[in-house]
Every structure is written in C-alpha cells, then in structure tokens.
From Swiss-Prot:
Species of provenance: Pyrobaculum aerophilum (strain ATCC 51768 / DSM 7523 / JCM 9630 / CIP 104966 / NBRC 100827 / IM2)
Protein keywords: DNA replication, DNA-directed RNA polymerase, Exosome, Magnesium, Metal-binding, Nucleotidyltransferase, Primosome, Transcription, Transferase
Residues that hold Mg(2+) 2 according to the record: D222, D224
EC category name: transferase
Gene3D superfamilies: 3.40.1360.10
Highest taxon listed in the record's lineage: Archaea
InterPro entries linked to this entry: DnaG_primase (IPR050219), Primase_DnaG_arc (IPR020607), TOPRIM_DnaG/twinkle (IPR034154), TOPRIM_dom (IPR006171)
Function: RNA polymerase that catalyzes the synthesis of short RNA molecules used as primers for DNA polymerase during DNA replication. Also part of the exosome, which is a complex involved in RNA degradation. Acts as a poly(A)-binding protein that enhances the interaction between heteromeric, adenine-rich transcripts and the exosome.
Protein name: DNA primase DnaG
Cofactor: Mg(2+)
An example Gene Ontology biological process: DNA replication, synthesis of primer
Lineage: Archaea, Thermoproteota, Thermoprotei, Thermoproteales, Thermoproteaceae
Amino acid sequence: MGALTIVAKYMIVAQIEVNGSVDKSDIIGALFSQTEGLLGKDMDLRELQMMGRIGRIEVDIFEKNGKTKAKIHIPSNLDRYETALVAALIESIERVGPYPAAVKVVEIRDLREEKRKKIIEKAKELVKLIEEEILPDTKEIIEKLKEDVAKAEIIEYGPERLPAGPDVDKSDSIIIVEGRADVVNLVKHGYRNVIALEGISRGVPQTIIELSKKKNVTVFIDGDKGGELVLRELLKVAHVDYIARAPPGKEVEQLTAKEIAKALRNKITLEEWLAQQKAAGEKAETPQQPPPQQPVPQQEVREEAQKPAFPFDITKKIDEMLGTLEAEIYDENWTLVKRLPVRELPDFLTTSGDSIYAIILDGITTQRIVDLAAKKGVKIIVTARTGPLTKVPENMQILTFDQLKKVE
C-alpha cells in the first residue's frame, strides 16, 4: 500500500551521505528497515505512513567521486514532539546496502507558519482591494453628504423660479452664478447668499435686475470665454459691484472650498475689470443702466449736507470700528443702543422698536439698509463704504470713513 496523501504540519529535511553508489530505493529501504522496531510499533515509519501520520518520503539524489549524496524530505502530520522523535530516528541510519552512511537533519520546517505567512500576505492584498474598490473614502462620503444637504437647501426664487441659496433675501450682498450646479456647490461650502441666472439665452431674468438695485452684487463666472459672455450680458442691464472668476479652464461647479474662497477673496471691482479689458485691447462695453435705475451720484449724496457734530472723536471711533464688521446703533442723544454684527443689521432695523438716530458700521451700506433705516427715521449713517444707491432721503446723511478722516 502506498503512502496516503496528507496535510502536513511539519517538513523534516535531512541530508544523507553514502560511501558508495546507491539509488533512491536503497536509501528509502534503509530508512524503513533500519528504524523498524527501534521505538515500538507506534513510531514505526511504515505504520505511520500507512496511517497517514507521515507522507511520501522524497529523495533527491546525486553521485560524485563514487559517493552518493541525497536530500531527504519527510512530511509529518504528527505533533512537534513526535516529529522531532522521527527526525532523530532517521539520524540513526548507519548503512545503505553494503556501504557506510551518515544522516544529518538540516531543519524541521513548520509548514503551518509558512501557510500563516501566506494567509497574512493574501489578507493584506484583500484589505487593500477592499479599501480601493469596495469601501468608499470618508472624504467622498462627507462630500456626498454635504452635496445632498446643499441640494435640500436650494430654493426657487422669484417668478422665474431661479435656483438660489436660502439667504438671498436676508443678506445685503449676493453672489450671482450661471447655473443650478454652481449654486449647489457654493451652498455646499457655506455660501448661502447665491443665486443662478439659469442661462442668458432668453435674457437676464428680471429678478436678478431687481436684486441688483438693492444689494451688493458679486458675479462669479466660469474661467472660460463663456463666463465672459455671461458677464457682458449681465452688465448691460444690472448693477454689478464685484467680479470673481474661477481658475482658467475651470467651472464654478467644479471648484473646491479652497478654490472658491481664493476666487472670492481675489474679486475685483467693475472699474478694475473694465480697466483690465481696456489694457488687454478689448472693447469692454460699459453697462448702460436704465434712467430710473441710475444710482444717485454718491458725491451729491455725501457732500451736500454739512458734517454733523459728533459728541466723541469720530476718527478714534472709526479706528475702533475698523476690522470688526460690526455696527453701532445710537439714539438722538448719541447714547449707544446696541452693537451687533453688520449681517444682523437688516433684521434689527426690521424688528426693533427702539428710536434710532445714527448708525456707524464697518461694512457696506446698501440700498436695502438705507430703505430700512429711513423707515426707522435714521438721520446719520457713517459707513466703511457704500454700494449702489438709487434713493437716499433728503433728511439722511451718509458719510464714509474716508470722508470723515479727510475732514479731520
């Protein structure tokens, strides 16, 4: 009966040197015959092989100078103690046929350890496969979540049902973009005062024109020729304060949070843009505003009235306010009523029951603020600067920080 095929735990590796010419069968025969009965029937090599406790004995043989050398491999399914005993047993061989012989065990390999190493290496490959192809990246999940939340926050604004962020009405300033995807991307990254043109094939929506009369407007265009065309059409009918542009070749909907922030931080005024177009040799068309929408010249608004008498050093107050992005509300006795962020000023003017005489703000005074202030009877507004103003009450003075510092 031949040896059974076994799943070996260990591999005994030994070398034998025979002082004569022999073949494989001689060596294998010597292993069985010379070890028979030495350690009892339970450790007899033939019995162990028949029971599947050791596997087929392999012998790799070569001769040189009349001597025979061979490497012996014996797979073992015994425990480590019994395997060591078998290894010691075969070292007891002294002859092969008529020739003296010597056997030396070179190593006992733990095949399970080798298998474990292979399993671990394979597991590493599979984990990498899972990470690369199966499990989504955490950043991707967060980006998808942000996008889903942004889409849920998008509203339809005006009779044209333009895609817009939820703060278009609340904010003193708006960002105008081309399409819905641009709105989604900006809202996703925290810019909620954004509204889309939704194309200009049918002209600039009237809603955009009306918003531009009363809010500070930044137009955020794609970094291609199409963005330039959209801007030119918009400038024909709407008031624009600033222009921001995506990096060359990129669209607003593709930008990352850092790219959006950088583009908006580097926005330029309309005047700067027109100067750039002129310098580049392009004939930029200066927007022609319809007569009813023409802003009242700021020079007239600011300088017709005499500078009011302030009960404190206004230059010091301006220096104190600069950089705070806050507004201070005063009554007719110049008593401070409230100090609040500029972004909360419109809501305060709408809901407050306090008597208001003057406002000092480190921000932009828009037409909306002027209208709300007029309803509250405000007589003086001191501001960092102004947006386009189409109507200022005769009994209201609007003075900028720069003007007051020059006077001082």
